[in-house]
């Protein structure tokens, strides 16, 4: 397994653990998690999270409407073309998966920071949407793996598109929400 993929999985695991810990803390104490990240750090973290979210939203919709459609085209040409495309796609994944993992980590980490430009309730919503996107990821990965191992099938393609649509919608809503909250509040 390539190092970038181990990094990707590890980052998603940390994001999920941070989210679960925040949910558990809030459920038990009926208070938000303690703010370990000061306001100045949170301003930078939220800005980075917002930028990463919008980058990933663009990538998600490009993949949904363009890149994944190429699987259908390549399968029509033949198995050799399809597998060559799949291998090339997999080799180029770091540019997609590492910023995605960083965005999810930024927003789940923001649950543990002081409230700044984006209110705590919005941070919870954005982090939850990031977690929903993480939970949809295995189905897309399994569909891609199935197509790489056994070639293109309509069922695997539908699974890929459906799970990717869930991820794309969740991240788009999160990005719009973060942007609206960032603009809504007066600048300090």
Can you describe what each PLM-predicted range is?
Residues 96-111, 167-176:
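Core segments of transmembrane alpha-helices
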